[in-house]
Design a protein with these regions (language model features):
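N-terminal helical cap/lid subdomain that shapes the substrate entry/recognition surface
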Residues: 2-95, 99-104, 117-120
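Asp-based, Mg2+/Mn2+-dependent phosphohydrolase catalytic module
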Residues: 95-103, 115-255
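Ser/Thr-glycine-rich phosphate-binding loops at phosphate-binding pockets of nucleotides
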Residues: 2-3, 112, 176
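Residue-level marker of regulatory loop/turn positions in helix-turn-helix DNA-binding domains and
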Residues: 90, 111, 144
């Protein structure tokens, strides 16, 4: 939803499948609700949604517990590994933006809620398309994933950059924006290409203009409410934000 997989489709599709296997259908909105978290935490948070808990109790005669979450996470891993490459196309504009940032001496760090074995598939597919971040940190590499700041701060260490207030966190999820804020970084929310709208590129492009504007406005409002310093549609539009951040840093401003 940030650099690849327009609409953040890969995990959402698999979460729906996992709950179907457990006999409790969930909606795509329910599958997306905790997006950005470590995937086991994500499954647990879905089981905490009141409507899902009610369906689960109706089906199984009890509420979901830790063993259910463990079992669904065990189902999730192979399903996700099997389909990742189907959703690995880079989001338009990614390569040009990364080239420009690197020409300005900016290092590129990546964070993800995927496990390391899943991330290796994404990194391989991204590299084949010409994109390779300088550092990648998974939720499984640190004590806790989003919205905690640990993945961002591990990237700071890996990249040996300082000060933190000169770093920028770009994300398509609310927990990802919170992650950046908690790390003390500037934040740029991507409202259209990721989880907030949750549509593949072709489906987004096919929407009537009025529907696009309604959905876009809702996503922008949610990201601003989460505290994002800037919100744009996709990665292709974020370079002016960096120009503004540099101006604000020169004035002594901090996130």
């Amino acid at each position: 939803g940030t650099t690849m997989d327009f609409g953040c489709m890969a995990p959402a599709v698999v979460f729906v499948k996992v709950f179907e296997r457990a006999g409790v259908p969930i909606t795509m909105d329910e599958a997306r609700a905790p997006m950005g978290a470590h995937k086991r935490v994500h499954i647990q948070k879905i089981t905490e949604i009141p409507a899902v808990r009610a369906r689960w109790e109706s089906k199984h005669g009890r509420l979901p517990g830790e063993k259910d979450v463990d079992r669904m996470f065990a189902d999730f891993v192979p399903l996700q590994l099997a389909c990742l490459s189907e959703y690995s196309a880079l989001i338009p504009g990614t390569l040009d933006v990364m080239k420009t940032l690197r020409a300005r001496g900016i290092k590129i760090g990546s964070t993800t809620g995927y496990l390391r074995e899943m991330t290796e598939i994404n990194l391989r597919d991204a590299k084949r398309q010409g994109y390779e971040p300088d550092s990648t940190v998974c939720a499984s590499d640190v004590p806790a994933g989003r919205p905690y700041p640990y993945m961002c701060l591990q990237n700071v260490i890996n990249l040996q950059v300082s000060p933190v207030e000169a770093c920028v966190k770009v994300d398509d999820t609310i927990p990802g924006i919170e992650e950046g804020l908690n790390a003390g970084m500037w934040t740029i929310g991507l409202a259209v290409s990721g989880d907030e709208i949750g549509l593949p590129l072709k489906d987004w492009q096919a929407l009537p203009d009025a529907e696009k504007q309604t959905r876009r406005q809702r996503a922008y409002e949610r990201m601003r409410m989460a505290g994002a310093n800037y919100v744009v549609d996709t990665i292709a539009e974020m370079l002016p934000c960096f120009d503004d951040i540099e101006t604000r840093l020169a004035r002594g401003e901090k996130p």
